[in-house]
């Protein structure tokens, strides 16, 4: 992401007034719509040319995925419950399914909101590609970068128009809600990104909530 942002600066597209915005999805793993996520999984496999994965037909994959995502049970106060929304936290399959679900979600969002011929970067599945879509925000967007459910973008319009776009994105899916941070200095994952008079500055970012649980570097 840093290299792409530096390239964006070198192309003269970062101005002194360019805003940075980061947002993430609230409780993505536990808010995945189960049936829709399974539909997206099959769509993803078909779109990438898979009829089988390691010899397993995609119909069988859906059946197995259905068991994994829908047969999560847990006990609370001497009662048993079955999870009907989302998947198990910490499950490798939930992570994969969430990433694929976001692949579809972002496609829909991009088609509605992003400009023509702009860079659209995805780190979650290690893919960089171009989209030819609505020119509504062609002078406003620089690029968007996503890692699973954490998204970074640049914005060259007003802060009000950015809030308007994000509010629209928040209404795009009932289960997907965005928490945003906007400014010329914003954290993204483990990087603090700053726009200092049209120059990109970065440094390591430590989440304050995580500090008490991180072992110091020189510790044994």
Each language-model region and where it sits:
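Charged structural interfaces that engage phosphate-rich ligands
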Residues: 1-220
């Amino acid at each position: 992401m840093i290299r792409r942002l530096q390239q964006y600066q070198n192309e003269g597209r970062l101005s002194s007034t360019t805003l940075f915005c980061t947002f993430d999805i609230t409780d993505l793993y536990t808010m995945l719509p189960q049936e829709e996520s399974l539909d997206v999984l099959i769509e993803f496999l078909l779109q990438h040319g898979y009829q089988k994965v390691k010899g397993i037909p995609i119909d069988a994959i859906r059946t197995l995925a259905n068991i994994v995502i829908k047969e999560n049970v847990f006990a609370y106060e001497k009662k048993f419950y079955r999870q009907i929304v989302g998947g198990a936290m910490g499950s490798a399959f939930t992570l994969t399914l969430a990433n694929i679900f976001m692949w579809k979600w972002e496609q829909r969002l991009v088609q509605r909101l992003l400009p023509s011929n702009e860079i659209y970067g995805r780190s979650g599945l290690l893919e960089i590609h171009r989209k030819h879509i609505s020119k509504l925000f062609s002078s406003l967007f620089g690029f968007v970068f996503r890692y699973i459910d954490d998204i970074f973008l640049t914005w060259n319009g007003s802060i009000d128009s950015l809030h308007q776009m994000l509010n629209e994105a928040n209404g795009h899916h009932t289960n997907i809600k965005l928490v945003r941070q906007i400014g010329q200095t914003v954290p993204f994952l483990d990087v603090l990104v700053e726009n200092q008079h049209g120059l990109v500055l970065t440094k390591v970012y430590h989440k304050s909530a995580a500090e008490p649980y991180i072992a110091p570097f020189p510790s044994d």
